[in-house]
Amino acid sequence: MNKDLKGLYAALLVPFDENGQVNEQGLKQIAQNTIETEELDGLYVNGSSGENFLLNTEQKKQVFKVAKEAVGDKVKLIAQVGSLDLNEAIELGKYATEIGYDALSAVTPFYYPFTFEEIRDYYFDIIEATQNNMIIYAIPDLTGVNISIEQFSELFNHEKIVGVKYTAPNFFLLERIRKAFPDKLILSGFDEMLVQATISGVDGAIGSTYNVNGRRARKIFDLARQGQIQEAYQLQHDSNDIIETVLSMGIYPTLKEILRHRGIDAGLPKRPFKPFNEAHRQTLDQLIAKYDL
């Protein structure tokens, strides 16, 4: 790796206006919040939490640009460029590399039943075109793509595939990957399983709720690495109470409402997502007060 990419990252939220356009000022505020308030190590930009798959190519570039302008070189930046359109993925990868992103990431191609060889070559083609480091984004519950340990081995043989964002509940496979590839980067993608992932030896984590709950995630991560498992679990219980409540109200509009409570112009989710339901206002206010969000 050209740069140490270990640590905790916010899966950056993106604010939109009523017309579905990116709210640049609000995006800068959200990005800065992750550094100044949540004290995270980096940003994972244009992932699921950024509602990436609802954006056109120019909007994705806009998000990359504004996030980079907001944080400069203060934290590490990973650009998620995955797309069903390989040409778009390459275009985005080149752009993010040119403006200074530390690494690329790409979700596995989804919807169509691609063969592993097609998936492998998709990654190799992006790397060849961009000459940047690549982090595989494995999220089988949403893509339907399960990568075996043998297939991970074939991918990791490429020197520029430096790691994986592992968003899966299969901790046996996670342990196997960690044992087989001790020098590869593993970033956990399930906020609700941070203790278990840390015990399994991940190098960090990427989370949507870290936009508002990053400090608690940091404590969980540090305590688990230090062997203080019961203390880490107690904080994980608190985090999971937060996550459960947020999910019940709609994750993206609710996280944006928590940011709005902090005075951040967090905008709206992009349609067809609905805005925050005011019927949940009392529940949200109680959540913010109870967990100091």
Curated annotation (Swiss-Prot):
InterPro entries: Aldolase_TIM, DapA-like, NanA, Schiff_base-form_aldolases_AS. It is an enzyme of class 4 (lyase). CDD domains: NAL. Keywords: Carbohydrate metabolism, Cytoplasm, Lyase, Schiff base. One of its GO terms (cellular component) is cytosol. It catalyses: aceneuramate = aldehydo-N-acetyl-D-mannosamine + pyruvate. Pfam families: DHDPS. The active site is at residues 137, 165. Homotetramer. Belongs to the DapA family. NanA subfamily. This is N-acetylneuraminate lyase.
